[in-house]
Amino acid sequence: MGEARRDSSSSLQHKKPPWLKLDIPAVVPPAAEEPSFLQPLRRQAFLRSVSMPAEPARVPSPHQEPRRPVLQRQMSITQTIRRGTADWFGVSKDSDSTQKWQRKSIRHCSQRYGKLKPQVIRELDLPSQDNVSLTSTETPPPLYVGPCQLGMQKIVDPLARGRAFRLADDAADGPSAPHTPVTPGAASLCSFSSSRSGFNRLPRRRKRESVAKMSFRAAAALVKGRSVRDGTLRRAQRRSFTPASFLEEDTADFPDELDTSFFAREGVLHEELSTYPDEVFESPSEAALKDWERAPEQVDLTGGALDRSELERSHLMLPLERGWRKQKEGGAAAPQPKVRLRQEVVSTAGQRRGQRIAMPVRKLFAREKRPYGLGMVGRLTNRTYRKRIDSYVKRQIEDMDDHRPFFTYWLTFVHSLVTILAVCIYGVAPVGFSQHETVDSVLRNRGVYENVKYVQQENFWIGPSSEALIHLGAKFSPCMRQDPQVHSFIHAAREREKHSACCVRNDRSGCVQTSEEECSSTLAVWVKWPLHPSAPDLAGQKRRYGSVCHQDPRVCDEPSSEDPHEWPDDITKWPICTKSSAGNHTNHPHMDCVITGRPCCIGTKGRCEITSREYCDFMRGYFHEEATLCSQVHCMDDVCGLLPFLNPEVPDQFYRLWLSLFLHAGVLHCLVSVCFQMTVLRDLEKLAGWHRIAIIYLLSGVTGNLASAIFLPYRAEVGPAGSQFGILACLFVELFQSWQILARPWRAFFKLLAVVLFLFTFGLLPWIDNFAHISGFISGLFLSFAFLPYISFGKFDLYRKRCQIIVFQLVFLGLLAGLVVLFYFYPVRCEWCEFLTCIPFTDKFCEKYELDAQLH
């Protein structure tokens, strides 16, 4: 076969005419595949502009089969936990949540801590410092267009920086409208990476109004005499165009269209704003072009590169997109005017009627965000960013999204509800700053009326008394541990009761358990065992302690005194007799009399008296009808309330450390807390989220209450004082972390310090605990450094953050452990500590916190 083919070809060569010449072209290798980022540019829609004709449609290339996706190993549980923990602490390397947090932190900083540095305002495109742009932070690689595309040459635009460098009047007058292009605009790849572009994110709708805001608007409408529906309709009619949050959906629907750059002369901006058509932007007028052509110094700029140094010298670092100047086909290039260029990035999807005001609408209806370091306090103190901020920092700022302040709303609801219930159930104590005294004539245990006085500390917060607050769950050391002084006080009272006996009056008017000194030898008989003949036997011997009014081991059936469960000789260890076998006549004087006094727990220190019910009610005590001795009742259990102790002799209500955070001393106290929560706490929670703020709030409050319980053990303390100062510490930490981007950080620091010192001075009044303030502030500092992610200024700062999390967590745990050891194992008695929390301007201004200062 091969020989036959060679013979046929040689025969054809001989038959070829001499004038015939065959030129067979060589095989051209296939062209290299275009870069992936240039694939969309093959479509005609991206190469269109107003003054450039459309390219003829090309034959589509055959469809290629998609590649199979690369299989990836699923993360293990350990890796998932590790990555989630890193994201939560804000130290992840490739975490989108970290970037969102950091961008949001900058917004909060701009609102709370004053002005930013001027270069930051210019680079972030923040005329009002409430909208952070990242377009200027991303400079995509140069755009290369092959010579086969309409005669275009390679374009390298080194000044394509985005929107950040804008004219000064733009920052003053707000966002400028798109200008008419002098030269045809080109497709922009920067719009794909721009944070303002809709191609890079899913459409986001505006969140609904909060319930509190709608309720407040409804209440305002009712006060003004209008209906809520009318007000809603009037507000709805004011909007004649679609909000920006819904316009973003149009952008997301056309991912194959790029942004177009438009350039305009500065002088004709305001004249042509009203003449823009709805669908397209036209070129400048012919008269304007003729004026530019008359200038002799103008040169042909077609195809020339933009002079970056000249723009920088004239402070016109413009947000240039990838573009070029195209030379006219088939002739000499027409001279193009050398003008000042301005640019507004306009999405092609916005080329519809009504879209020319999309940017002002977007800023008008966008939900207000909290810049990092510039929150509510920053607006009050006029804080601003510094002029220059690194692009990495700006990227972190813009990625931050606000959180819903669920914890603030829940906490405010609980505080309000508990305060209302406490005031309704326990009433209101006398209002004032001193002590209130009540004197009345009351029948006591001796059978005669006596003038008695009841002393009560006034409450200027308009709320319950200190005894009622302790019963509700206030911070009170004797209810949380076995206080040494309270325990010794109760033990001494029981020793006195051990040597007491029943005092029976001679006129048979009654009997009461008293000591020998309190029983009259002429009007009564003190039935003391074993001197009295009614003494019973115990193990063959007379009992030495007793007698007890209306209680005798010989006549009690439940519990009975039988061997081997005989009642001991010590009467303070006798149980309560619930059933007696004998009637009214036992031939024992201490059993046949009418008892006129029973145990009554008075005050907050565990003091017990055997007295009448009338006196006990007057002293606001707890009367025990079933008992006959004070040793048979546990007054601290009555005073503390809540859950009973596991061991009646050992108080164990440690949960008061966090339970008291939800109580308030009165209505005014609750209003102050609500105002703080709806301003400072709500603002911080929108930045950090409910979980971080809840941890800092609760742990700071617990630490503050623990320190207060150590240094002021006998004072009933309620309210989130430590928690509030812990939240204030978050503001200091936020200020320290945003120190590099603030224009005047020292000014913001001294303003915050003045606020804290004022609140600390306010804590010198009664019912306000400065020990909780100090400890809560210190613990809040440690917790904020550990749990609040912040802006990182480089890789070293990221590693430092990880070490900082571990160190401050260990420091806080050490502080908490030290306070626990001091509270439970090494109690501290500090006599001068009360002057740090309340200055006694008068003798009755501050409540006396000593153990036996108030025996009522």
From Swiss-Prot:
Cell compartments where the protein resides: Endoplasmic reticulum membrane; Golgi apparatus membrane
Record-listed Phosphothreonine modification sites: 180, 183
Post-translational modification Phosphoserine, affected residues: 76, 176, 391
Molecular function per GO: growth factor binding
Stretches of the chain forming a coiled coil according to its record: none
Subunit-level organization: Homodimer, or homooligomer. Interacts with TGFA and HBEGF. Interacts with EGF; may retain EGF in the endoplasmic reticulum and regulates its degradation through the endoplasmic reticulum-associated degradation (ERAD). Interacts (via cytoplasmic N-terminus) with FRMD8/iTAP; this interaction leads to mutual protein stabilization. Interacts with ADAM17/TACE.
Family statement: Belongs to the peptidase S54 family.
Descriptive protein name: Inactive rhomboid protein 1
Gene this chain is encoded by: RHBDF1
